[in-house]
Regions:
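RNA/tRNA-interacting regions in translation and RNA-turnover enzymes
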Residues: 1-252
Length: 254
């Protein structure tokens, strides 16, 4: 995982040099692979730090997790992101039913989307410095939240969903074409997101191509979920899909 030092400083007040910060991160068990200085047109002098995080530190696969460790060490104030409440303005057009392998599954419908709009430059810079390519505002904001909070999000094109959503295991013979165009034959233990007609995502790993966001997308269902780590870990290995979402969801977060 790599990140901007200036972005980290928004979450925890650290006044040490980049070199000292890297030494302290390593002592805290977050080994620094490398770092490089960067001059930002938006935030001034900055550094990009790359960590080699071990599987037992799943709580540090986010800026907030790293900031929490540094806050405890330095005795500095931890500043949580301040969410803005957005009241519901439309009725939910569908229902969601889940199984026990999805202890938490929530989402929000967002309409009147214009993908001709550009991602704000600061968000674009931060995800680029973190090793992600800026694609469009929807993908960019899901990656931003993933990096900052460690919570994977997935956006479905609402107009491509047919009926209610389900979190379930496959029916015999079901298949799914993923966003990377890989076609997979689903096993009995492959946890899925489906609508009433078909599978639409391999839960916690990758969405399906058929319901993916495109330049013509106007409405989305934005998913935020926690799946039991064992249900994700085995499938990620089986299909050789170690995605940024599956890495985080397959680890136990503290």
């Amino acid at each position: 995982m790599q990140f901007s030092k200036n972005w980290l400083r928004e979450l925890v007040d650290i006044k040490v040099s980049t070199e000292e910060l890297c030494e302290q991160l390593t002592l805290l068990g977050l080994e620094v692979d490398n770092y490089k200085n960067y001059q930002s047109d938006l935030t001034g002098e900055d550094s990009v730090i790359k960590l080699d995080i071990t599987p037992n530190r799943g709580d540090c696969f986010s800026l907030l997790g790293i900031a929490r460790e540094l806050s405890a060490f330095y005795g500095s104030q931890l500043s949580y992101p301040n969410p803005i409440e957005v009241k519901q303005s439309i009725e939910s057009p569908l229902d969601v039913k889940v199984c026990k392998s999805a202890p938490s599954y929530i989402g929000r419908f967002i309409t009147k989307i214009d993908l001709n709009k550009k991602t704000p430059l600061l968000i674009k810079e931060r995800i680029n410095l973190s090793g992600f390519r800026s694609i469009d505002p929807i993908v960019d904001i899901t990656n931003y939240v993933l990096l900052q909070l460690g919570q994977p999000l997935h956006a479905f094109d609402q107009d491509k969903l047919q009926g209610d959503l389900r979190v379930r295991f496959p029916k015999k013979g079901e298949k799914l074409t993923l966003l990377d165009e890989q076609k997979i034959q689903l096993d009995d233990d492959s946890l899925l997101i489906t609508d009433e007609k078909k599978p639409v995502a391999l839960a916690g790993i990758m969405g399906g191509l058929e319901t993916g966001v495109s330049p013509d997308t106007e409405s989305i269902f934005l998913e935020s979920a926690f799946f039991k780590p064992g249900a994700i870990r085995g499938q990620a290995r089986k299909f050789k899909l170690q995605t940024d979402a599956s890495i985080r969801l397959s680890l136990i977060h503290i």
